[in-house]
Amino acid sequence: MSRIASTFSALKSQGRKALIPYVTAGFPFADITPELMHSMVAGGADVIELGVPFSDPSADGPVIQKAGEKALALGIGLAQVLEMVRVFRQKDGTTPVVLMGYANPVERYDIKHGGSATESAFIRDAAQAGVDGVLIVDYPPEECVEFAARLRAHNMDLIFLLAPTSTSARMAQVAEVASGYVYYVSLKGVTGAGTLDVDAVEAMLPRIRQHVKVPVGVGFGIRDAATAKAIGKVADAVVIGSKIIQLIENQPRDKVATVARDFLKEIRAALD
């Protein structure tokens, strides 16, 4: 059983929901990410999603795009992100870490670091670093069968996005290859946009669960404890990204970790 699966299993037995914060690796300071990850765990995070900066992030809203641009300007690429996970793992061997990003940096990493037709350098190095799951926004499920199998061989999960526009056929395709959890994007459009319609989310989840047997996390548009609590009543996990980025983007270095921790404590208290 993967670390993600055992985390969800433990939470389910306690009747609790997973809190999954997202931060862009290397933001707002190049070297702050491992410390920020530890502070989010202290605030109640069950799984951490780490965004891999990319120059053309089609699914990200302006807040996360801007964070990615800053991280890229600070020299953060996939190799640096894996090093951050290694550093985090020196003190935390239990909290699952998911890398969220796009196909291009993964493919470039494989070319640069000696991937072959039978082995992906990215998968090898991610497993060694202590990564638990991968969410590649622009990898369609029908093209991911082999990638998913290679990840599973290293005890890593392949996580997919589902949207309000996802058809039953698409959900069935995702169910074939997804493991760990699926991430339901509760708004049409890009991350951090608009307000959340909890009733619409609640109506959609039974449809998703007909097809998908892994836990369902809901994100995009969750900004406060009240919304998190409402979503937590219907979903297995609450994912929060843009709001955390906004809270930390203008903080002095010594305040970043505490601001993130204190915000997550509020969300955790509401979920529990």
UniProtKB/Swiss-Prot annotation:
Matches recorded under SUPFAM superfamilies: Ribulose-phoshate binding barrel
EC code(s) of this entry: 4.2.1.20
Transcription keyword on record: no
Active-site residues from the entry: E49, D60
Catalytic reactions on record: (1S,2R)-1-C-(indol-3-yl)glycerol 3-phosphate + L-serine = D-glyceraldehyde 3-phosphate + L-tryptophan + H2O
Disulfide bonds: none
This protein's UniProt keywords: Amino-acid biosynthesis, Aromatic amino acid biosynthesis, Lyase, Tryptophan biosynthesis
InterPro entries per record: Aldolase_TIM (IPR013785), RibuloseP-bd_barrel (IPR011060), Trp_synthase_suA (IPR002028)
A GO molecular-function descriptor: tryptophan synthase activity
Source superkingdom: Bacteria
UniProt pathway annotation: Amino-acid biosynthesis; L-tryptophan biosynthesis; L-tryptophan from chorismate: step 5/5
One annotated Gene Ontology cellular component of this protein: cytosol
Function: The alpha subunit is responsible for the aldol cleavage of indoleglycerol phosphate to indole and glyceraldehyde 3-phosphate.
Subunit annotation: Tetramer of two alpha and two beta chains.
Family classification: Belongs to the TrpA family.
Name by which UniProt lists this protein: Tryptophan synthase alpha chain
Upper lineage: Bacteria, Pseudomonadati, Pseudomonadota, Betaproteobacteria, Burkholderiales
